């Protein structure tokens, strides 16, 4: 993932180039606002590898990323919004042959799951991921991968083990806040 200001097309493309030279085959870029979303077309046109939009809070940013031609999205069930927003994103992803990564973080698990389990835990993360994947499947969308992250490495491992028993989707294993190049 880039750590540049996505709105700075020149700096972001330079970082993408450095990542590609080090072997990256796809690069994720943050899309925190519409100004960043407006830069995505230029990034897509200038990138030699597929780009994935990291989306939080505003489903319209996901729609803008898909309209700009990005190949994938990372969405967080804990903050993407209600079902009707997810449905719009899924329909746009299908229309654009894009992949969706359902990325669950223990720190942003949905409130009803926090209440059910008494706080963030392995089971809450897995239930969040699986219920969100079902929303995608309900719309006939299966180009999905899943990630689970906790500040506890042991909880992250346990969550992936539990998730792997429950589905056959590809699992995206990453390190949060790993730093830049």
What is the predicted role of each segment?
Residues 33-55, 88-100, 131, 160-171:
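Alpha-helix-loop-beta-strand connector modules within alpha/beta enzyme cores
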């Amino acid at each position: 993932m880039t750590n540049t200001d996505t709105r700075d097309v020149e700096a972001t493309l330079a970082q993408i180039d450095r990542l590609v030279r080090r072997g990256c085959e796809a690069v994720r870029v943050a899309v925190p606002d519409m100004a960043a979303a407006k830069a995505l077309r230029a990034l897509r046109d200038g990138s030699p590898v597929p780009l994935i939009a990291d989306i939080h809070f505003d489903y319209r940013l996901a729609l803008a990323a898909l309209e700009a031609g990005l190949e994938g999205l990372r969405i967080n069930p804990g903050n993407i919004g209600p079902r009707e927003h997810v449905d719009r994103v899924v329909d746009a992803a299908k229309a654009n042959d894009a992949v969706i990564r359902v990325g669950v973080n223990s720190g942003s698990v949905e409130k009803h799951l926090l209440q059910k389990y008494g706080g963030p835990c392995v089971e809450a993360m897995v239930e969040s991921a699986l219920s969100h994947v079902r929303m995608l499947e309900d719309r006939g969308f299966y180009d999905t991968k899943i990630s689970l992250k906790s500040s506890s490495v042991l909880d992250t491992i346990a969550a992936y083990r539990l998730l792997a028993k429950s589905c056959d989707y590809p699992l995206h294993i990453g390190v949060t806040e790993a730093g830049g190049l």
